[in-house]
Amino acid sequence: MSSLVLQCWKLSSPSLILQQNTSISMGAFKGIHKLQIPNSPLTVSARGLNKISCSLSLQTEKLCYEDNDNDLDEELMPKHIALIMDGNRRWAKDKGLDVSEGHKHLFPKLKEICDISSKLGIQVITAFAFSTENWKRAKGEVDFLMQMFEELYDEFSRSGVRVSIIGCKTDLPMTLQKCIALTEETTKGNKGLHLVIALNYGGYYDILQATKSIVNKAMNGLLDVEDINKNLFDQELESKCPNPDLLIRTGGDQRVSNFLLWQLAYTEFYFTKTLFPDFGEEDLKEAIINFQQRHRRFGGHTY
């Protein structure tokens, strides 16, 4: 007798029927935790079946339909995704590699995510590349990152995306500052996805620089105290784009780490244990599906 113990989501039928001498498509499913196959090969069949069965003993704790394209709602697509790209160092250490090998995946993986996001109709990605606190890391690692960030132009200048950099640029190496200026100038006319990279950025820093700018304008008679409101403050922040709808953090930690503190007030958060170098198309779609299943009230009530 074949046996199947599972939790199942997003199948075209709420019930699963097992019969002998038929096959189960493992390619259509993900999240298999336990699998026992006694002396029988597993036959791959067409995807999308609403009846699945097998002639072997299959035990699983979680079975989930993987074909996420049909589950995405274009009308509920987030316009702006904030991304904390965490887990590069752990990815390298888990493989017995130097941490630099993990960091090398940052821009290629980010470009991959931008390509996927563009096809899905997402308009803005804001990616946290280097925080104001990351200077505390070992000098060798920081030096490597500064050199690696100079690959920005080669990676994105011909990608079709518009690139903007936020953060305190004056503290960065001069060669990197020139690379940033060249990349922003080269891509400013691109009509595709807007990629905002937070480099030497922190939420505290952004709020403080906005406050100082407003105070300076008030002291110089350029605005009255009564003119100061949320909209004015928004304009003084470096991000200068609509606030994120969805924040995705890879690597398992569940905190914002001083990222976009003002802008995340009503953002939906999604945390995944997947390390950033392993974060791919299905992971992104899974995060978006999770986002689309939420009811955003923005502090109000809907009945």
Curated annotation (Swiss-Prot):
Its EC number is 2.5.1.92. Specifically forms (2Z,6Z)-farnesyl diphosphate (Z,Z-FPP) from dimethylallyl diphosphate (DMAPP) and isopentenyl diphosphate (IPP). Also able to use nerylpyrophosphate (NPP) as substrate. Involved in the biosynthesis of several sesquiterpenes. It catalyses: 2 isopentenyl diphosphate + dimethylallyl diphosphate = (2Z,6Z)-farnesyl diphosphate + 2 diphosphate. NCBIfam families: uppS (TIGR00055). Keywords: Chloroplast, Plastid, Transferase, Transit peptide. Belongs to the UPP synthetase family. This is (2Z,6Z)-farnesyl diphosphate synthase, chloroplastic. One of its GO terms (cellular component) is chloroplast stroma. HAMAP family: ISPT (MF_01139). GO terms for molecular function: (2Z,6Z)-farnesyl diphosphate synthase activity; ditrans,polycis-polyprenyl diphosphate synthase [(2E,6E)-farnesyl diphosphate specific] activity; magnesium ion binding. GO terms for biological process: plastid membrane organization; polyprenol biosynthetic process; response to cold. It holds the Pfam family Prenyltransf. It is found in: Plastid, Chloroplast. The active site is at D86. Residues 1-45 form a transit peptide. The keyword Transit peptide applies. Coiled coil: none annotated.
